[in-house]
């Protein structure tokens, strides 16, 4: 069944975050929930994004310090850097730098990055420098997926003045969806429409976010469309060493031995296919000979059933 996707609203906030609202339908009953849940999960946790992962501040070696002549303390500056909406097209580490003198209200646009890094909200405040004081920053930006907490073990091996930050790479901030069950197709059969609201940090548009999420789901399900089921053939169990013992080594009487040989019984393996009743049906094979065979098998740890297995 073909369905349509319509963007019914698109807004850009003062902080450059974007909100897109989409209608998807008509869908069969139940499909809207399937689509909504799948897209929401990928949108919120599966898309790659950019984030500040570490900050170096000249003269500072721990996050609880204060900076002379700067209104904000180090924790405030780290939080402001963490909240930056950034889009880096470089899969490798990018480093931005700031050297500023007061009086100055430092904003995100004051940080110098390469052409591969775009600061979405350039007016985001970073710090306030008083007259006669300086501030030097080095900001590390990386690409990633999801949320990456500070690695405390790795932190011990990094430079003492490089302050690591819990990185939030998720470009989508919020996803809401609802289902409209009022649509009715020809013939009176029920239909659904999925209404999705996607809010991004501005580093990507809601349209691109949905497209990327859909492509990830396609890649996830594609192998299932071409899977070939191969029936496993069970391996034949290897016979036990006792089953390989030839009939001669059971030390049977001549009468019992000859009767079994005429019945094409040449080894213990052949005897294991017989029951006590089967032995009695061998020509000239009486109960005494059958008991003799049972005892010989029990001496090597093998037993056979008294009667045939019923089918």
UniProtKB/Swiss-Prot annotation:
GO terms for cellular component: cytoplasm; DNA-directed RNA polymerase complex. InterPro entries: DNA-dir_RNA_pol_insert (IPR011262), DNA-dir_RNA_pol_RpoA/D/Rpb3 (IPR011263), DNA-dir_RpoA (IPR011773), RBP11-like (IPR036603), RNAP_asu_C (IPR011260), RNApol_insert_sf (IPR036643). One of its GO terms (molecular function) is DNA binding. Its EC number is 2.7.7.6. Residues 1-228 are annotated as: Alpha N-terminal domain (alpha-NTD). GO terms for biological process: DNA-templated transcription. Gene3D superfamilies: 5' to 3' exonuclease, C-terminal subdomain (1.10.150.20), DNA-directed RNA polymerase, insert domain (2.170.120.12), RNA polymerase, RBP11-like subunit (3.30.1360.10). It is an enzyme of class 2 (transferase). The keyword Nucleus does not apply. Keywords: DNA-directed RNA polymerase, Nucleotidyltransferase, Transcription, Transferase. SUPFAM superfamilies: C-terminal domain of RNA polymerase alpha subunit (SSF47789), Insert subdomain of RNA polymerase alpha subunit (SSF56553), RBP11-like subunits of RNA polymerase (SSF55257). Residues 239-311 are annotated as: Alpha C-terminal domain (alpha-CTD). It catalyses: RNA(n) + a ribonucleoside 5'-triphosphate = RNA(n+1) + diphosphate. In cyanobacteria the RNAP catalytic core is composed of 2 alpha, 1 beta, 1 beta', 1 gamma and 1 omega subunit. When a sigma factor is associated with the core the holoenzyme is formed, which can initiate transcription. The N-terminal domain is essential for RNAP assembly and basal transcription, whereas the C-terminal domain is involved in interaction with transcriptional regulators and with upstream promoter elements. DNA-dependent RNA polymerase catalyzes the transcription of DNA into RNA using the four ribonucleoside triphosphates as substrates. Belongs to the RNA polymerase alpha chain family. This is DNA-directed RNA polymerase subunit alpha. It comes from Prochlorococcus marinus (strain MIT 9312).
């Amino acid at each position: 069944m073909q369905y349509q996707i319509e963007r019914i609203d698109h807004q850009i906030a003062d902080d450059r975050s974007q909100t897109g609202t989409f209608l998807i339908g008509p869908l069969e009953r139940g499909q809207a929930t399937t689509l909504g849940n799948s897209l929401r999960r990928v949108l919120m946790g599966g898309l790659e994004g950019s984030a500040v992962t570490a900050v170096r501040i000249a003269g500072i070696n721990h996050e609880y310090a204060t900076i002379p002549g700067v209104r904000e303390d180090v924790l405030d500056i780290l939080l402001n850097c963490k909240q930056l909406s950034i889009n880096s097209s470089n899969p490798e580490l990018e480093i931005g730098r700031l050297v500023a003198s007061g009086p100055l209200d430092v904003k995100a646009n004051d940080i110098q990055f390469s052409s591969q890094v775009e600061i979405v909200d350039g007016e985001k405040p970073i710090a306030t420098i008083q007259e006669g004081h300086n501030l030097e920053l080095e900001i590390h930006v990386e690409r990633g997926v999801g949320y990456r907490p500070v690695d405390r073990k790795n932190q011990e091996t990094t430079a003492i003045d490089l302050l690591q930050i819990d990185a939030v790479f998720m470009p989508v901030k919020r996803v809401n969806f609802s289902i409209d069950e009022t649509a009715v197709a020809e013939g009176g059969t029920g239909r659904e429409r999925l209404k999705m609201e996607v809010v991004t940090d501005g580093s990507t548009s809601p349209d691109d976010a949905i497209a990327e999420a859909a492509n990830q789901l396609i890649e996830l399900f594609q192998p299932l469309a071409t899977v070939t089921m191969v029936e496993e053939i069970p391996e034949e169990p290897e016979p036990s060493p006792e089953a390989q013992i030839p009939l001669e080594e059971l030390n049977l009487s001549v009468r019992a031995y000859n009767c079994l040989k005429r019945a094409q019984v040449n080894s213990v393996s052949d005897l294991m296919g017989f029951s006590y009743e089967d032995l009695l049906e061998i020509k000239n094979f009486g109960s005494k000979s059958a008991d003799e065979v049972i005892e010989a098998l029990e001496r090597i740890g093998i037993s056979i059933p008294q009667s045939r297995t019923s089918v």
